[in-house]
């Protein structure tokens, strides 16, 4: 029990814990696994060096530690090697072997391969026979060699031959294993190469025959190539070289190249080996035995470490060379994969599948004259580096005299010697080039290993060398000189090419070598092969382009003649021809041939010809006359020739002129005294050449000055010339001529086209007293005799810039080239600005004095203008000529108008259907005496309208612009009328009539400005003639206040028509008058003198017709009745402009109820028998009734007139069509005479109307004539006119049947020529065309209920009556498919749109449908014309007008004219002013 207790005591457990901890620590501190490697050295290897190599701590970073066993042995027989390795495996448990020997026995490699295949142990042969080439290895072997493969050595041999351009060779081999691989590698390489290889012979020698000497000798005699490749063992090579020497294949001119297998141990050289033998060998100099042992151990250890890291085990050690089991095979195969791919210390130590290194360290060794192997090259990273750029010829001293292979030095200098790189694909030079070597000077170079690179040379001198060598029969090695250039003697020693020849490193020197006396003392020169000397090269400097270069294609005389012919001759000729042409703008210089038509002035003629010269697409006015057109055509031909000639010569003058420094020679002042010029003249040359020597010997001062400008080479000198650092370059003429000919852009030239100073020549330098001189001279002379030298000169020395054959180089034009054009534009803009300022100064400051405002008399400008007009038109201008007299006063002559009417009717018939519509272009109305037009400055044809004009209240700043226009007009009426001068600049927005509400609205101003007016000649009729009663004055005010847009474009079917002209689309602007009018009277007149735009010119014919009418001499002795009281009228208008208290401002009004109210008013009038001549309530003017004008009552401004004067002024004893006095007419304003006063006409008008009874009616509906005296109701302001059924039937019988729309040209003729008579509406010959098969076939037929209209008691139907629902019917408004009125066109702005924009609202009136019954019971006159209420889009400017002269209201002369009476033409035509656009017509 006691012993058991001791075992279980705590002390026992403590001991166990300590043992456990110590055991765990021991396991944790256990060393990493190790691998046994045996290093076997055979021979006298340095064991100490090897021990130091593997004992270094270089493998501590690996997971496996190498355990190296050094073994030394002397026997190299197979049995000894096998026994020793097997003993090491059983005793030392080795897992790898590193084997090295110092023998040349390739059999050792075969033994090691056998052992590795049997024991599955990795073996590395690192030196000696163990590393020699072994062709066929066992598949299971892990034998690796530190040496190149057969294929690698064959590639290195080919690179050596390629380096020295040895392309012709032969192959000699024995039956040693691997010879087939060697030959196959050579053949495959040369077949797939771009180099022109020539494999002459492949000899396979059998060394086993007893009588082989004679056979081998016979085979070797077949060899003729200078390069021979040999593949065999070292022993076999000794015998082969002995036989080759006997047949003369080892002497001078033959080069043998052998692999490392032949060279073997470099310490032992057989005596049979020829001098100059080249071998590819493993590097023994930089990669010695200790380094190889260290790398061998590292390879095996690294592979085991990688295997352990991935698989956690390493191969088990081999205990015996026998009984190999499967597990050992698996482990060895796995280790073999890691041995192939090994990288140690950043170096790739991998092996190929055949057991050779992938990147071996190879060297090229040469057996020199001392019978020692000399390293002359290195193969590294698949590139060859050789020591000698020219291969040395190793031959006996006695044979040196007979050497025909020469070493030649040259110098790069185009075009004589041009150096290029080798072909990147083949690594060789092309056929037309010669290989040449260029040394590389590096800091680390040694005399034994100078670096160089292979280049290819060509050029003029190289071609001469090739021809000479072929003629003289010698070969050569060419290299580039690195010590200097051509050659200069420094401190008694020559450098450059001359120095190479003097030092006998080269036999000849070929290049651009100048012959001189100093060089001829040390070398011999051949005859010159090219003449040269000293020449000077300069650069073409860019000159400046003149700012007037764009004008230089033509001389100043040509430019002056062109402008004179344009401005004076051609333009004036075209204008004169057009002026006098019967088909041109005949004598109407201002407005063209037709009123409102285009004009043709001298300015337009100049503009036309200017546009033709420069082919500018500008809008021009073409002439109409044949003569002027011919003139323009001839000018166009001139313009083509002029512009083509200018364009063809422009480029020559826009380029920069080049400047070249002119130098006469080396004695020129610029060379001898360069500092006398500013800046100093800079010149230089390339030092150490014949040029510098010549200058130094002859021009010492010049040589001293040019030293600081000397250049390192020709290329540097050319660059300095182009960049402006050098002004002249002095050098050999041959070189400079070539450079000038090949210069890009031909900017470099030689003075005097290659002028040469100090002529000499280029020659070939040969060693002194050499036997080659005579042969070379004869060869050069032969080249001259055969003409080959000229061919070479043409090939190499002629450039593209020579002989002035260079092409013109195109270049971009910069700002310098185009500066003159920009200067001209800048000057034009400056001149335009000055003209603009002068124009404004004259217009705002000096114009008024020239116009006569300052002196109160006609100014100079006015006098000149009227004088020109008098000369052109033959009209005498009197200073105080009556405004009633005018050359156009005869236009109202009755007989003349009849003839014009016939001609116009014919023209209208010929122009039917113009623009696709037969509708009339203008509704002609009867002309009657016009009341005073307060907007006379607009020059529209205006007369009384059957509308009241109720003026809206004044609102500040609402219509200030428009009021200011009216103020300017009325402030200068007297002077304006006397001078017949008008202001149309701001007054062409829209047409106006005398009844225009805006004509009065525009006069309202919150500041009550005073106005001065001039009385006007009108018939003696009241101002309110034709105005409706005051009952509807509010409605007319709303019509004038708003414009009505059709709801056709707003979602409704009804259409509200507008009487606005299709051309009058100008937006109306409004303003207000501020300030004291008395201070502005003068300024108002100044504003009225503003220049009119072209759009206002079309109204001039209207004005002249109207003035002719008004200026007609009075028919009565008392002509004062044509003028109203000036002061009274002025006071009346002043009263209109005063601010009214409690007057409402502008506001939006719902017109629906108002429109209905108007319909009701017409209905009541119809029921009560009201007619067109019904006398209604008094008419309101302005904003109150106190200014109303009632029939028979004097106007407010005429309240001071006596009853006799008023009766005389308002009487009806004047013709309705003309202001002729009716002497036999009673002036009693009662009864029927009161109702038909305005319908009375004189005998002449009646006869004219009955002479040609052409039934026409554009929109006039036959209204019943009153048959009984007017019944005066209790209301003094209302008069009723009953209708006669009989008369209605007669009128119905005479109703028009045809209607057409006038073309614009016809309308213009009517304006100018047929102003007094309305033209025939449509040609009768077109009626048949419209009747059948036409969409207008039924437009001439009466509707079913057309008789209803004649039976109506009231001749004025309701405004809301629809045409298609109207029982009365009537004709269709138009047979045209185009919109009849402007409100049907949504693209024409109206007055209402302007109001909407002004107040920020949308269109605010839409027609409400009316009751059919009401329409039938009370037809409206507007409904007979259109199916929409005729609401003017210019209300507020022009009130709505009835068609023709349907007068409504209490008036002294109300009437409804029938269509048989002649009617004077009214230019206002329902408020329209038609204006022809200049862009519509094209005459060419």
Curated annotation (Swiss-Prot):
Residues 27-555, 648-819 are extracellular. The record marks 615 as: Functional determinant of NMDA receptors. The modification Phosphotyrosine is found at residues 962, 1039, 1109, 1133, 1155, 1474. Keywords: Calcium, Cell membrane, Cell projection, Chromosomal rearrangement, Cytoplasm, Cytoskeleton, Disease variant, Disulfide bond, Endosome, Epilepsy, Glycoprotein, Intellectual disability, Ion channel, Ion transport, Ligand-gated ion channel, Lysosome, Magnesium, Membrane, Metal-binding, Phosphoprotein, Postsynaptic cell membrane, Receptor, Signal, Synapse, Transmembrane, Transmembrane helix, Transport, Zinc. Changing residue 1415 to L: Found in a patient with autism spectrum disorder; uncertain significance. Disulfide bonds join 86-321, 429-456, 436-457. One of its GO terms (biological process) is chemical synaptic transmission. Primarily found in the fronto-parieto-temporal cortex and hippocampus pyramidal cells, lower expression in the basal ganglia. Changing residue 553 to R: Changed glutamate-gated calcium ion channel activity characterized by increased glutamate and glycine potency and slowed response rise time and deactivation time course. GO terms for molecular function: amyloid-beta binding; glutamate binding; glutamate-gated calcium ion channel activity; glycine binding; ligand-gated monoatomic ion channel activity involved in regulation of presynaptic membrane potential; NMDA glutamate receptor activity; transmitter-gated monoatomic ion channel activity involved in regulation of postsynaptic membrane potential; zinc ion binding. Residues 604-623 are annotated as: Pore-forming. Changing residue 652 to G: No significant effect on glutamate and glycine agonist potency. L-glutamate binds at residues 514, 519, 690-691, 732. It is found in: Cell membrane; Postsynaptic cell membrane; Cell projection, Dendrite; Late endosome. Residues 1272-1289 have a biased composition (Polar residues). Residues 1290-1301 have a biased composition (Basic residues). A motif (PDZ-binding) lies at residues 1482-1484. Residues 1292-1304 are annotated as: Interaction with DAPK1. Residues 1074-1097, 1161-1194, 1271-1301 are annotated as: Disordered. Heterotetramer. Forms heterotetrameric channels composed of two GluN1/zeta subunits (GRIN1), and two identical GluN2/epsilon subunits (GRIN2A, GRIN2B, GRIN2C or GRIN2D) or GluN3 subunits (GRIN3A or GRIN3B) (in vitro). Can also form heterotetrameric channels that contain at least two GluN1 subunits and at least two different GluN2 subunits (or a combination of one GluN2 and one GluN3 subunits) (in vitro). In vivo, the subunit composition may depend on the expression levels of the different subunits. Found in a complex with GRIN1 and GRIN3B. Found in a complex with GRIN1, GRIN3A and PPP2CB. This is Glutamate receptor ionotropic, NMDA 2B. It comes from Homo sapiens (Human). The gene is GRIN2B.
């Amino acid at each position: 029990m006691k012993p058991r207790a001791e075992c279980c005591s705590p002390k026992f457990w403590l001991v166990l814990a300590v043992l456990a901890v110590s055991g765990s620590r021991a396991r944790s501190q256990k060393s990493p696994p190790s691998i046994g490697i045996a290093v076997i050295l055979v021979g006298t290897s340095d064991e100490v060096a090897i021990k130091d190599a593997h004992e270094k701590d270089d493998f501590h970073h690996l997971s496996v530690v190498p355990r190296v066993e050094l073994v030394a042995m002397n026997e190299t027989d197979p049995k000894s090697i096998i026994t020793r390795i097997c003993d090491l495996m059983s005793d030392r448990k080795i897992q790898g072997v590193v084997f090295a020997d110092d023998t040349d026995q390739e059999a050792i490699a075969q033994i090691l391969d056998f052992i590795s295949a049997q024991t599955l142990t990795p073996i590395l042969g690192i030196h000696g026979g163990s590393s020699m080439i072994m062709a066929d290895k066992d598949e299971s072997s892990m034998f690796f060699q530190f040496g190149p493969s057969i294929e690698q050595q064959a590639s290195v041999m080919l690179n050596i031959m390629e380096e020295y351009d040895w392309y012709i060779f032969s192959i000699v081999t024995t039956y040693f294993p691997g010879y087939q691989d060697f030959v196959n590698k050579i053949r495959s390489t040369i077949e797939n190469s771009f180099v022109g290889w020539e494999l002459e012979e492949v000899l396979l020698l059998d060394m086993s025959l007893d009588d082989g000497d004679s056979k081998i000798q016979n085979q070797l005699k077949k060899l003729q190539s200078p390069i021979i490749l040999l593949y065999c063992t070292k022993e076999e090579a000794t015998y082969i070289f002995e036989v080759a020497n006997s047949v003369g294949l080892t002497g001078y001119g033959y080069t043998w190249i052998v692999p490392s297998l032949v060279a073997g141990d470099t310490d032992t050289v057989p005596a049979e080996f020829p001098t100059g033998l080249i071998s590819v060998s493993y590097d023994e100099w930089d990669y010695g035995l200790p380094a190889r042992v260290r790398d061998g151990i590292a390879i095996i250890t690294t592979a085991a470490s990688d295997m352990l890291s991935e698989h956690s085990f390493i191969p088990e050690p081999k205990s015996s060379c026998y009984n190999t089991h499967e597990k050992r095979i698996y482990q060895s195969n796995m280790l073999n994969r890691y041995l192939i791919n090994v990288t140690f210390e950043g170096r790739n130590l991998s092996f190929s599948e055949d057991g050779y290194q992938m990147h071996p360290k190879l060297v090229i060794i040469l057996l020199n004259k001392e019978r020692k192997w000399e390293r002359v090259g290195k193969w590294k990273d698949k590139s060859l580096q050789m020591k000698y750029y020219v291969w040395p010829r190793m031959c006996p001293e006695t044979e040196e005299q007979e050497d025909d292979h020469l070493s030649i030095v040259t110098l790069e200098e185009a075009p004589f010697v041009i150096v290029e790189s080798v072909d990147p694909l083949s690594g060789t030079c092309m056929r037309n080039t010669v290989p040449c070597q260029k040394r590389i000077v590096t800091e680390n170079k040694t005399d034994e290993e100078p670096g160089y690179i292979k280049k290819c040379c060509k050029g003029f001198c190289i071609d001469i060398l090739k021809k000479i060598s072929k003629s003289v029969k010698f070969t050569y090695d060419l290299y580039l000189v690195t010590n200097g250039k051509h050659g200069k003697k420094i401190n008694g020693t020559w450098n450059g090419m001359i120095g190479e020849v003097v030092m006998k490193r080269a036999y000849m020197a070929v290049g651009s070598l100048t012959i001189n006396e100093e060089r001829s003392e040390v070398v011999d020169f051949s005859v010159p092969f090219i003449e040269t000397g000293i020449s000077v090269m300069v650069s073409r400097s860019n000159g400046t382009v003149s700012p007037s270069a764009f004008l230089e294609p033509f001389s100043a005389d040509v430019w002056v003649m062109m402008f004179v012919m344009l401005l004076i001759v051609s333009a004036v000729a075209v204008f004169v021809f057009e002026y006098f042409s019967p088909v041109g703008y005949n004598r109407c210089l201002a407005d063209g041939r037709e009123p409102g038509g285009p004009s043709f002035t001298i300015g337009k003629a100049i503009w036309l010809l200017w546009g033709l010269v420069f082919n500018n697409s500008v809008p021009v006015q073409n002439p109409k006359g044949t003569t002027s057109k011919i003139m323009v055509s001839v000018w166009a031909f001139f313009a083509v020739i002029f512009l083509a000639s200018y364009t063809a010569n422009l480029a020559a003058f826009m380029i920069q002129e080049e400047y070249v420094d002119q130098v006469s020679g080396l004695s020129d002042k610029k060379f001898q005294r360069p500092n006398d010029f500013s800046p100093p003249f800079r010149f230089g040359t390339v030092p150490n050449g014949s040029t510098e020597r010549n200058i130094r010997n002859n021009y010492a001062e010049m040589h001293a000055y040019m030293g600081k400008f000397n250049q390192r080479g020709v290329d540097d000198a050319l660059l300095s010339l182009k960049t402006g650092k050098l002004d002249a370059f002095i050098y050999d003429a041959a070189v400079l001529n070539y450079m000038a000919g090949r210069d890009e852009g031909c900017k470099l030239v030689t003075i005097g086209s290659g002028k040469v100073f100090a002529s000499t020549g280029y020659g070939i330098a040969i060693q002194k007293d050499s036997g080659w001189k005579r042969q070379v001279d004869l060869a050069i002379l032969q080249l001259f005799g055969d003409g080959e030298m000229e061919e070479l000169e043409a090939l190499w020395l002629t450039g593209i810039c020579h002989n002035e054959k260079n092409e013109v180089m195109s270049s971009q034009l910069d700002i310098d080239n185009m500066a003159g054009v920009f200067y001209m534009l800048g000057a034009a803009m400056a001149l335009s600005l000055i003209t603009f300022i002068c124009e404004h100064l004259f217009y705002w400051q000096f114009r008024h004095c020239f116009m006569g405002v300052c002196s109160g008399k006609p100014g100079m400008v006015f006098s000149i203008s009227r004088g020109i007009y008098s000369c052109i038109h033959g009209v005498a201008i009197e200073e105080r000529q009556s405004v009633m007299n005018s050359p156009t006063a005869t236009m109202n002559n009755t007989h003349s108008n009849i003839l014009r009417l016939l001609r116009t009717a014919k023209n209208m018939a010929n122009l039917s259907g113009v623009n696709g519509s037969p509708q009339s272009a203008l509704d002609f109305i009867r002309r009657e005496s016009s009341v005073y037009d307060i907007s006379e400055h607009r020059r529209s044809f205006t007369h009384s309208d059957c509308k009241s004009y109720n003026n809206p209240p004044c609102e500040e700043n609402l219509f200030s612009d428009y009021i200011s226009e009216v103020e300017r007009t009325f402030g200068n009426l007297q002077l304006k009328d006397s001078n017949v001068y008008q202001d149309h600049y701001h007054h062409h927005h829209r047409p106006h009539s005398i009844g225009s509400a805006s004509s009065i609205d525009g006069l309202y101003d919150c500041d009550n400005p005073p106005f001065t007016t001039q009385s006007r000649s009108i018939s003696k009729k009241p101002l309110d003639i034709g105005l409706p009663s005051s009952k509807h004055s509010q409605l007319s005010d709303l019509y004038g206040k708003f414009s009505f847009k059709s709801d056709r474009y707003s979602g409704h079917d009804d259409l509200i028509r507008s009487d606005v002209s299709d051309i009058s689309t100008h937006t109306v602007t409004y303003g207000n008058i501020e300030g004291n009018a008395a201070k502005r009277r003068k300024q108002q007149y100044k504003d009225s003198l503003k220049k009119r735009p072209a759009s206002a010119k079309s109204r001039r014919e209207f004005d002249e017709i109207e003035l002719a009418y008004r200026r007609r001499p009075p028919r009565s002795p008392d002509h004062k009745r044509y003028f109203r009281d000036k002061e009274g009228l002025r006071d009346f208008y002043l009263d209109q402009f005063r601010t009214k208290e409690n007057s409402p401002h502008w506001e939006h009004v719902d017109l629906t109820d108002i429109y209905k109210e108007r319909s009701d008013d017409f209905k009541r009038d119809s029921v009560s028998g009201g007619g067109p001549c019904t006398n209604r309530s008094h008419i309101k003017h302005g904003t109150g009734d106190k200014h109303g004008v009632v029939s028979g009552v004097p106007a407010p401004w005429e309240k001071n007139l006596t009853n006799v004067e008023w009766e005389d002024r308002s009487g009806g004893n004047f013709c309705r069509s003309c202001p002729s006095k009716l002497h036999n007419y009673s002036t009693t304003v009662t009864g029927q005479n009161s109702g038909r006063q305005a319908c009375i006409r004189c005998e002449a008008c009646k006869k004219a109307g009955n002479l040609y009874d052409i039934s026409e009616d554009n929109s006039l509906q036959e209204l019943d004539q009153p048959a009984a005296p007017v019944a005066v109701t209790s209301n003094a302001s209302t008069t009723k006119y009953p209708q006669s059924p009989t008369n209605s039937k007669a009128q119905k019988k005479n109703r028009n049947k045809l209607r057409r729309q006038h073309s614009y040209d016809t309308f213009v003729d009517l304006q100018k020529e047929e102003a007094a008579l309305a033209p025939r509406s449509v040609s009768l010959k077109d009626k048949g065309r419209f009747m059948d098969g036409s969409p207008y076939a039924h437009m001439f037929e009466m509707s079913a209920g057309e008789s209803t209209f004649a039976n109506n008691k009231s001749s004025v139907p309701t405004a809301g009556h629809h045409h298609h629902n109207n029982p009365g019917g009537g004709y269709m408004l138009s047979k045209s498919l185009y919109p009849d009125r402007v409100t049907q066109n949504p693209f024409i702005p109206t007055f209402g749109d302007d109001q909407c924009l002004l107040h920020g609202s949308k269109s605010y009136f839409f027609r409400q449908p009316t009751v059919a019954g009401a329409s039938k019971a009370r037809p409206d006159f507007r409904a007979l014309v259109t199916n929409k209420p005729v609401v003017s889009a210019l209300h507020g400017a022009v009130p709505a007008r009835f068609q023709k002269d349907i007068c409504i209201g209490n008036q002294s002369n109300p009437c409804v004219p029938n269509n048989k009476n002649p009617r004077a033409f009214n230019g206002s035509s329902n408020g329209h002013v038609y204006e022809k656009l200049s862009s519509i017509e094209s005459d060419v």
